[in-house]
Amino acid sequence: FFPIGVFCKIFKTC
């Protein structure tokens, strides 16, 4: 799965 940082950038949900 994607790292939390990448997930943040793509889905804009931190």
From Swiss-Prot:
Statement: the UniProt record of this protein carries the keyword Disulfide bond: yes
Gene Ontology CC, one term: extracellular region
Spans traversing the lipid bilayer: none
Major localization listed first in the record, in broad terms: secreted
Subcellular location: Secreted
Keywords: Amphibian defense peptide, Antibiotic, Antimicrobial, Disulfide bond, Secreted
Disulfide bond annotation, renumbered to this chain: 8-14
GO biological process assignments: antibiotic metabolic process; defense response to Gram-negative bacterium; defense response to Gram-positive bacterium
Tissue expression profile of the protein: Expressed by the skin dorsal glands.
Free-text function comment from the UniProt entry: Antibacterial activity against the Gram-negative bacterium E.coli and the Gram-positive bacterium S.aureus.
Protein name (Swiss-Prot/TrEMBL): Japonicin-1
Species of origin: Rana japonica (Japanese reddish frog)
